[in-house]
Amino acid sequence: ASYRWIQLILGIVAMAMIANLQYGWTLFVDPIAAKHGWSRAAIQVAFTIFVLTETWLVPIEGWFVDKFGPRPVVLVGGVLCGVGWFINSFADSLATLYFAAVISGIGAGAVYGTCVGNALKWFPDRRGLAAGLTAAGFGAGSAVTIIPISAMIATRGYQDAFLYFGIGQGIIVVLVALCLSRAPEHKKGEAVANVQQTKRDYKPSEVLREPVFWIMYAMFVMVAAGGLMATAQLGSIARDFKVFDVQVSMMGLTLPALTFALAIDRVLNGLTRPFFGWVSDQIGREPTMFIAFAIEAVGILALFHYGHNPIAFVILTGIVFFAWGE
């Protein structure tokens, strides 16, 4: 029983180490633009490429996990994540930046998909909680590194931040990967009473023929778009709202509004995952999604109308990320 918790913790650590590839990106956009004179739109194409390769290749990476186990897939993913940020550190053309996005996206997808899938296999009796805790590593992982990354960008330049954090995070993921193991096939758990669960596994071709799959796919594309927009563009939004470097004092801390928002957002984005995982085990998946999606929608609209106030900016971005992390 204790061994599966060790496997869960290892997955959480790996997820935390790849979080900055997505959640820390907004800190780099303006420094890159200032150095090379590229437009924000051109730079953000790299983020789009990253998200596409991070998500769309997960089924293929899942096949490798089924065939070879989680260890080699996460190991390769960790190497690719480190290499991607290493390339970013010296990228002097948009083509190189885009290539690095492909590399790091494949790596992040391999780590993310494998760690979540492995957690579900080790905890068939507590799937919502296991998935939530593992995803929390990704959501909150950058909370402890956002401030030092921001400080390094300000003092030593974004290239050093890419280089040192990329290599460091990649090494940790590789070390974690060496300790991962496949859940035993015979491991069973009691189904959660309040949650409907399928009686059999579906083949990919069968899944594609189910209407509910396409409904869920469209639903999550739309929901993810709102959160990813905030993730990638938060720095630019803060500048447009003129709250980027306005000092905000809350909870005994005084930080620039953007830095404060990023730190709080990452904490809430992490806490919400096990929270909503627990809620979904209690009331079901569909009611939980309805609640979370509604909160996110209200948060984004409120941010649009009231985000020019630095305190409101911090609080409302926290609400958006709390709901989006579900």
Which residues does each PLM region occupy?
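Residue-level signature of mid-helix packing/kink "hotspots" within the transmembrane helices
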Residues: 23, 51-59, 142-143, 266-274, ...
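Extracytoplasmic gate region of multi-pass secondary transporters
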Residues: 25-30, 205-278
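Intracellular juxtamembrane helix-capping segments at the cytosolic ends
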Residues: 32, 110-123, 130-131, 326
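Helix-breaking motifs and short loop linkers at transmembrane-helix boundaries and internal kinks
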Residues: 37, 69, 90-95, 107, ...
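Conserved MFS/SLC helix-loop-helix module at the cytosolic interface between two early adjacent transmembrane helices
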Residues: 56-95, 280-286
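Paired small-residue
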Residues: 84, 95-103, 311-319
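Helix-loop-helix hairpin linking two adjacent transmembrane segments in secondary transporters
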Residues: 134, 138-185
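C-terminal transmembrane helical hairpin of 12-TM major facilitator-type secondary transporters
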Residues: 220, 227-229, 252, 256-326
